[in-house]
Amino acid sequence: MSIKALILLDDASNGRLYLQAAQHLGLHPITLASDKAQCDMLAGEGMEAIRIDTDNLDGLIRECSRLSTTFDIVGITSALESVYATVGKLCRHFDLPGPNPESIERCCDKFVQRQLLAKAGVPIPAYRLAVNAAEVQSAAAEIGLPVVLKPAVGSGSSGVRLCRDVVELAEHTTYLLGGKHIWRSSPRMLVEEFAQGPYYSIDIMGDEFMGIASGEFGPPPHFIFQGTTYPAQLTSDECKRIADISLSCLRALDLEWGPKNIEFRWTNLGPIVVEVNPRLSGSPDPQLVKAAYGVDLITEHIKLVIGEEWDLRRKRSYVAAARKLVADCDGILDWIDGEASAAAVPGVAEVKLYVEPKAPIVRKGDYRDCIGHVIAASPSRATTEAVLKRAVDLIDWSITPFPSGDDAIAEFACAGLLG
């Protein structure tokens, strides 16, 4: 009997969780990735990884066909948004369960997504599309500052910035168009109204709602998550308003199959949709759901992918919270301590560091600025918050700034303290 294999395209923040969940389900995970370093790292961990251009659909079809002569390929998926439409095309070609690739492509283009949501009457921020600096300035003048300027395609808050005045607007426009931002296609930018208010996100599988989380960002102008709590403190009526709008989003975007994550801001006018993501949110959100409700969204997603019955029934009702550890300067990470002590605190569900000592730290103003996270969970919100604070306070690090332009060695270090 052939070994049952799950094909995974590229890697993401929760890619390792997909590999582990696949193995737990008795599957042999095979990663197809374009990054050689990623393949080498996975191979070093005993995982099967094949280097291939994941933007080449025909090449992927040939490789999957080759693998099917050895393995019983029971599913194809990815944790990465940029290749998720390709996943849908592969699933369609091999007659496997998967997302509608056309729906994914429409959703991943933030401008097209906005058009479809607006047509359906979904509350969204005012927006304009721009392809050059003049159009950015004109759009911002029409909408009114502050505005959010971001690439029309992308994820992880890469290239996303709050522009509070014309100087910040010009600076970020230059950044996006001046060669520093990597574009996968011709530059297209979204200029949109800054929807101000508490942040919430809802996780959905198919048409079933898993729950609503609240989130906190670090200081502007960037949108870097500092903390997430599951579930959010909302009334039943407030939850229903978010759920009803979410259903309208799914209908407008034809997103019936698989996992979704929808982001909101609760403004003076009520909940406004900031973004619809046609996939699971990245780490540590799946771990938060597992800590709060005992439901492994990644495992349930894989079950859906391979055509097995999936189950989102909650096994408990805890409050889970995560705190991101964010680098506060650029340089070389000298040391980071306290991981073991933090993990030993009763109520801590997970402590994860993304970097090791001597690693270079270069902040990008997005998810890549995070160097770790801590998750705590308990039946009580107050207890969870106290446990999380205690654990985070035990972790400390030091970053030595890079040498200055004259190559002088910096004589000081900036400490990473989270109070």
Annotate each predicted stretch with a short phrase:
Residues 2-6:
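Extreme N-terminal starter segment of soluble prokaryotic enzymes
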Residues 43-131, 138, 370:
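Conserved N-proximal alpha/beta basic substrate-recognition cap immediately N-terminal to
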Residues 18-27:
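A short, Lys/Arg-enriched amphipathic alpha-helix followed by its capping loop at the start of a domain
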Residues 15, 134, 302-419:
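Peripheral (often C-terminal) accessory segments that flank ATP-dependent C-N-forming ligase machineries
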Residues 176-180, 185-188, 193-232, 240-273, ...:
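Phosphate-binding core of ATP-grasp and ATP-grasp-like enzymes
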Residues 108-189, 196, 229-244, 248, ...:
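Active-site nucleotide/adenylate-binding loops and adjacent lid/helix of ATP-dependent enzymes
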